Design a protein with these regions (language model features):
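Cleavable N-terminal export/targeting peptides
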Residues: 1-35, 276-277
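Transmembrane beta-barrel domains of Gram-negative outer membranes and organellar outer membranes
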Residues: 25-277
Length: 277
């Protein structure tokens, strides 16, 4: 992928590379303020919360989806590790993929991997506003000959802005905005669809009720601006239960709201978090 074609992408990657230096050089203004984290993950959005230093989190997101072309399933596995209290590295693997197309044989196999990082500025202003910047790079290591994966390398910078409401049981609303630049780097069958750059956005909220967390997301992704035909929007209600300080479990049912969206999805969630020291 030629970065001179995408000056904004070049600037975002430069900022991403400077984040670790900034994290060590930034004056410590809000570190003494403890920001509650009633929830660790959402189902189809990134949250602003970072892992603390030497804290590691394992998350499993099994999912199933159905649309006019067939059925799909995957077992997304994610690892997050805190380098500092504000800077974390991320590893994701699509796990085992399964596709049952309406026309064609059923196919299955391992998916792609993603690596990246995220830096968070917590407790800004009055202490209830947070901001983070991150970037993920998807590497096309999955099989392409059978069409299970598409052979794209993808660069996915994103930002998240969140606002807490302590008077409402530490509930939160957030906005995420991101880009997805794609470039086909592996040979694929001639019938494969070309790749288009896309814009993604997520708006969501969660509300803690005892050990339960009610969640709601509106998730969008659009590549029409780059010549594609996809405009996906999902309404994603979900619920998460805090089994303990280290364990969470949940389920969500994203509902497609546009013609190009899946008819429906089911997303599971299992999280384990612990400190290494």
């Amino acid at each position: 992928m030629c970065l001179y074609r995408f000056p904004l992408l070049s600037n975002l990657i430069t900022l991403f590379l400077l984040v670790p230096w900034y994290a060590s050089a930034e004056p410590n203004k809000t570190r003494d303020k403890i920001v509650p984290q009633p929830i660790q993950e959402m189902f189809q959005s990134n949250l602003v919360y970072p892992q603390e230093k030497d804290e590691i989190q394992f998350t499993l997101f099994p999912s199933f989806s159905k649309n006019l072309s067939g059925q799909k399933a995957r077992t997304l596995f994610e690892v997050e590790y805190g380098i500092t209290d504000a800077f974390q590295v991320i590893f994701e693997w699509d796990g085992l993929l399964y596709q049952n197309p309406v026309t064609g044989p059923t196919i299955a196999g391992p998916g792609n991997i993603e690596v990246g990082a995220q830096y968070s500025w917590m407790a800004l202003g009055d202490g209830n506003t947070h901001f983070s910047f991150g970037n993920l790079i998807e590497l096309p290591v999955g099989p392409v000959a059978n069409g299970l994966t598409e052979g794209f390398i993808e660069v996915q910078p994103f930002i998240v802005l969140a606002r807490d409401f302590p008077e409402l049981n530490q509930s939160q609303i957030f906005l995420e905005f991101g880009f997805d630049w794609v470039d086909q780097v592996r040979n694929v069958p001639e019938s494969s669809a070309p790749g288009f750059d896309s814009i993604s956005w997520n708006v969501g909220a969660f509300f803690p009720i005892g050990f339960w967390r009610a969640t709601l997301e509106i998730n969008g992704s659009n590549n029409k601006w780059d010549g594609g035909s996809r405009n996906d929007i999902y309404i994603t209600p979900g619920t998460i239960y805090e089994l303990s300080k280290e364990w969470e479990i949940g389920i969500a049912a994203p509902i497609g709201a546009t013609k190009t969206s899946d008819d429906y999805r089911v997303v599971g969630y299992l999280m384990r978090e612990f400190e290494l020291d």
